Regions:
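Feature activates predominantly on carbohydrate-active enzymes
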Residues: 1-184, 198, 223, 227, ...
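Residues in intrinsically disordered, low-complexity segments of regulatory proteins
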Residues: 8, 40, 89, 130, ...
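Residue-level signal for alpha-helical context at structural boundaries
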Residues: 76, 83, 91, 185, ...
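Extracytoplasmic/secreted cell-surface and envelope-processing proteins
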Residues: 83-84, 127-130, 193-195, 245-246, ...
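Substrate-binding groove of N-acetylhexosamine-processing glycoside hydrolases
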Residues: 106, 161-182, 203-414
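Short, internal active-site loops enriched in acidic
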Residues: 124-126, 188-192, 241-243
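N-terminal leader/propeptide and maturation segments of large enzyme subunits in energy/redox metabolism
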Residues: 188-210
Length: 414
């Protein structure tokens, strides 16, 4: 086997291809493969807040991603239920189950050796119920701890300078552990009612000419981006941060294709995640059909077809929200300022996923997303997708169906 590559990372990806090829029982007598990635950002967002995944599990995830030629593990470290990062500046934030600095540095080094960047997410100003149990002065009033999943209304108070001083310390702690050029700042599912109930906040908005809580959220983002850039990092945030006056920020799209094009029209680079939610029980071919750079009408057609897919009727009601976000659709002629889709991320939210069920949810479909992000737009071999998946599964550890096999064995079945 002869491997030629222009970079170390290219050599790693070529070795992954060779490993997959050599894992098959029947090998061609001769073959030549010329390959390169289509997108720069080929990632997985893993929620470690709702359920905690120990370090050995994360290392297995990185190994599998390397075999799939992916290159970004986005760790959703914080949420309403838990805070998995140990901040020296704010030690009360850390949940009982959290990652030590040594563990995270080990993960970063392990990923780097395999061409996998580790991008941390500290989600704010919403999804901070756990924060406010530790430091109630950052919000409007104390809140009770919760392990119930779903959207909780508690938010940071963006009018208090003490909040920005705290975030400067926290993000500095994050930057010292994670060397990647990006820090994900969250920004999703902010409850306007939480801010509107405060006379002090509504007065602040009036004094500063803010017509809506979206303007207030954008003020918070501007302050947060300034802190992030001051640390020599670039910001990423979920697509709720879209605003005509938003600062430069890599936007992660999750609310349907229209927010992707809104970001591009504002001159913001974009990551696509909307069609790649692995915690939902979609067949792999549904994920595979979506092209991150396809035109808006093609994407909307696929969304509508998914709503009618008989295999998805068990989640059809939940999928209907994709139509709600079309209200802001734009006719994108040319992205502003050369903005582009940098790639995409599959997302695995862990409300109903734990270390035992992770292999099934992750490896059964992530290879399909990985191929979509790596291969050219003309690669549409959907008829043989499941044959390719079966071949890929044999190279992954643990096998996607390990959990089911163990449960069946416990029942005396095979």
């Amino acid at each position: 086997v002869l491997v030629r590559a222009a970079t170390t990372w290219g050599g790693l990806r070529a070795c992954a291809t060779a490993y997959q090829l050599l894992s098959h029982a029947e090998l061609p007598s001769f073959c030549r493969i010329e390959d390169q990635p289509r997108f720069l950002w080929r990632g997985l967002c893993l929620d470690v807040a709702r359920h905690f995944f120990p370090l050995p599990t994360l290392l297995q995830v990185v190994e599998g991603m390397a075999l799939l030629k992916m290159n970004v593990l986005h760790l959703h470290l914080t949420d309403d239920q838990a805070f998995r990062f140990a901040s020296p500046g704010w030690p009360a934030l850390a949940s009982e189950q959290h990652y030590s600095r040594q563990q995270l540095e080990q993960l970063v080094a392990f990923g780097s050796a395999r061409g996998i960047r580790i991008v941390p997410e500290i989600d704010m100003p919403g999804h901070v119920n756990h924060w406010l149990t530790a430091y109630p002065e950052w919000g409007l009033h104390p809140v009770a701890p919760t392990d119930r999943f779903g959207v909780h209304p508690a938010c940071l108070d963006p009018t208090r300078e003490v909040v920005y001083r705290a975030l400067n310390v926290l993000l500095q702690d994050v930057a010292e552990v994670f060397p990647d050029e990006y820090i994900h700042l969250g920004g999703d599912e902010v409850s306007p009612d939480w801010w509107q109930q405060s006379e002090a906040i509504t007065q602040f908005m009036a004094d500063n000419g803010m017509a809506s809580t979206q303007d207030l959220a954008n003020y918070f983002l501007q302050r947060l981006v300034a802190i992030t850039q001051g640390l020599g990092r670039k910001p990423v945030a979920w697509d709720e941060v879209l605003h005509p006056d938003m600062p430069t920020c890599l936007v992660q799209n999750w609310r349907g294709v229209t927010t992707r094009d809104q970001a591009l029209q504002l001159g913001q680079d974009c990551l696509v995640s909307a069609p790649f939610y692995l915690d939902l029980n979609y067949p792999a071919d549904v994920h595979y059909a979506f092209d991150p750079s396809a035109d808006q009408q093609s994407q909307i057609l696929l969304e509508d077809q998914s709503l009618e897919d008989v295999r998805l009727q068990h989640v059809a009601q939940g999928m209907a929200w994709t139509r709600m976000w079309r209200e802001g659709a734009v006719d994108l002629v040319e992205p502003l300022g050369g903005a582009s889709v940098l790639g995409g991320e599959a997302c695995l939210w862990s409300e109903l996923v734990d270390p035992d069920t992770l292999p099934t949810r992750l490896w059964s479909r992530l290879p399909a997303v990985a191929e979509r992000l790596w291969s050219s737009a003309s690669c549409r071999q959907i008829d043989h997708l499941y044959e390719r998946l079966e071949g890929c599964w044999e190279t992954l550890s643990p096998h996607p169906y390990t959990h089911q096999q163990q449960r069946l064995a416990g029942l005396g079945l095979s």
